[in-house]
């Protein structure tokens, strides 16, 4: 019978790791930029924005009485053959008493200014939030708990857990990722279920294309490392690396479509955004060791919480419904189409038709990127446009470095 001091082990449940990100600083800096990312008009000469709710971005650091400010129009231009041409305006939020219109009182009439206030806000008070120094702080992602701008405006999705390292990732993604335009309000919770998966897959493909090529030997090494360190190389199926998909036990994530497409399935990229890092898994999990005849088995129990107000909440729920115990199934929108009578016949030497000559497709010239917007501007315009960060198309999304698994590759 063993005796001695307690080993320090506990049966207490593992901590719940919640999704989130850096909070907006409570005190401003010497910069004069908005703390928040911009909303952008979809068309030239769009009217000022109208909001379903208060129009004040979420900021849990402020009391309800301080939740008031103004949206200010920022004219934008981009270079063209004739010099430059205007592009749809951007609108930035500032708290009352801060920013370019710091001398105005709440409600003072001025062109290009839209005043907003939350319920119960003391609009006679002036904020001590200050403004942002772009060299020290990133823009804080926009979230509206009570409704965002009308359908004439959109904004780019920025994850709440993006750090400063996310700026270069977002810029590189913006430079290479362009997707078709869509209808509906950009960034609203109700419009976030459209083609997020396709955008995520596009980012992965573009980064693979831009990065160093993975040789056949490297891919084979990635797929045959120690099991817990394996990653799926391009062109590999899930079951080639992690074994057949199952139900009700380990290896139960992934439907037939995900198994076939591997990492090119955008749902993989989306869910990697919720997977814990190595450190989080080790220090945030409940670790259970068990000696077995074949060796030591370590079990890691980890919980990631996706808040219900997360813009991608419905997408994560949908992916889980499709992929957990999903072997033998496919997404409803990916059911194989029935083959026509002529194409369903097996081809033979005598009956196979001669292949039609394919027309060569013209290569599309890459469009000029929006990050050239500040070129050919005067020094004064450069200063006023200094805060135009993350000036991406509606389809650009940055999942963050951890979601792309670059440390594993």
From Swiss-Prot:
Localization recorded for this chain is: Virion; Host endoplasmic reticulum-Golgi intermediate compartment; Host Golgi apparatus
Give start and end of each CoV N CTD domain.
215-331
Specify where it is mainly localized.
Answer: virion
Kindly provide the PTM information from the record. ADP-ribosylated. The ADP-ribosylation is retained in the virion during infection.
Swiss-Prot/TrEMBL keywords = ADP-ribosylation, Disulfide bond, Host Golgi apparatus, Phosphoprotein, Ribonucleoprotein, RNA-binding, Transcription, Transcription regulation, Viral nucleoprotein, Virion
Where along the chain is composition biased (Basic residues)? 70-84, 358-367
- Outline the segment boundaries, as ranges, of region: Dimerization: 226-333
Tell me yes or no: is Transcription among this UniProt entry's keywords: yes
In this UniProt entry, the residues modified to Phosphothreonine are 378
Disulfide bonds, paired cysteine numbers: 320-323
- Outline the segment boundaries, as ranges, of region: Disordered: 1-32, 44-84, 121-194, 238-258, 327-409
| Domain CoV N NTD, residue spans | 31-156
Mark out the compositionally biased spans (Basic and acidic residues).
180-192, 247-258
A GO cellular component annotation here is: viral nucleocapsid
Question: SUPFAM superfamilies, alphabetically?
Answer: Coronavirus RNA-binding domain, Nucleocapsid protein dimerization domain
Q: Which GO terms describe its molecular function?
A: RNA binding
Where Phosphoserine occurs, the residues are: 190, 192, 379
Q: Where is the composition biased (Low complexity)?
A: 15-31, 162-179, 341-356
Q: Where is this region: RNA-binding?
A: 29-160
How it assembles, according to the record, is:
Homooligomer. Both monomeric and oligomeric forms interact with RNA. Interacts with protein M. Interacts with NSP3; this interaction serves to tether the genome to the newly translated replicase-transcriptase complex at a very early stage of infection.
What family is it from?
A: Belongs to the gammacoronavirus nucleocapsid protein family.
Name of the protein described by the UniProt record: Nucleoprotein
What is the species listed in this Swiss-Prot or TrEMBL entry?
Turkey coronavirus (strain Minnesota)
């Amino acid at each position: 019978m063993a005796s001695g001091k307690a080993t320090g082990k506990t049966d207490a449940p593992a901590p719940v790791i919640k999704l989130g990100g850096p909070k907006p600083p409570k005190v401003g800096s010497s910069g004069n930029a908005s703390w928040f990312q911009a909303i952008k008009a979809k068309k030239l000469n769009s009217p000022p924005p109208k909001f379903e709710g208060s129009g004040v971005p979420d900021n849990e650091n402020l009391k309800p009485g301080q939740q008031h400010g103004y949206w200010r129009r920022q004219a934008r231009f981009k270079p063209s053959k004739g010099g430059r041409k205007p592009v749809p305006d951007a609108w930035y939020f500032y708290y009352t008493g801060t920013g370019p219109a710091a001398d105005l009182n709440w409600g003072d009439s001025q062109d290009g200014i839209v005043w907003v206030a939350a319920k119960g806000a003391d609009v006679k008070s002036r904020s001590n939030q200050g403004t942002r120094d772009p060299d020290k702080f990133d823009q804080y992602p926009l979230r509206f708990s009570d409704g965002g701008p009308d359908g004439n405006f959109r904004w780019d999705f920025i994850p709440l857990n993006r750090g400063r390292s996310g700026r270069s990732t977002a810029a590189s993604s913006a430079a290479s990722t362009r997707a078709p335009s869509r209808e509906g309000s950009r960034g609203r919770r109700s419009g976030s279920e459209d083609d997020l998966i396709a955008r995520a897959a596009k980012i992965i493909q573009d980064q693979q294309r831009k990065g160093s090529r993975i040789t056949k030997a490297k891919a084979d090494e990635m797929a045959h490392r120690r099991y817990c360190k394996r990653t799926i190389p391009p062109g590999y199926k899930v079951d080639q690396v992690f074994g057949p998909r199952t139900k009700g036990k380990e290896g139960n994530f992934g439907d037939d479509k995900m198994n076939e497409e591997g990492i090119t399935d955008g749902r993989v990229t989306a869910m990697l955004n919720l997977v814990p890092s190595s450190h989080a898994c080790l220090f945030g999990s409940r670790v259970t060791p068990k000696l077995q005849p074949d060796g030591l088995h370590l079990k890691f129990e980890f919980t990631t919480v996706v808040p219900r107000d997360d813009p991608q909440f419905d997408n994560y729920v949908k992916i889980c419904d499709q992929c957990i115990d999903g072997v033998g199934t496919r997404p409803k929108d990916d059911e194989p189409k029935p083959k026509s009578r002529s194409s369903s016949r097996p081809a033979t030497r005598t009956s196979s038709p001669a292949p039609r000559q394919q027309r060569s497709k013209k290569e599309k010239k890459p469009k000029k990127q929006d990050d050239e917007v500040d070129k050919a501007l005067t020094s004064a315009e450069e200063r006023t446009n200094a805060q135009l960060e993350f000036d991406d198309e509606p389809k650009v999304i940055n999942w963050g470095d951890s979601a792309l698994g670059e440390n594993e590759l």
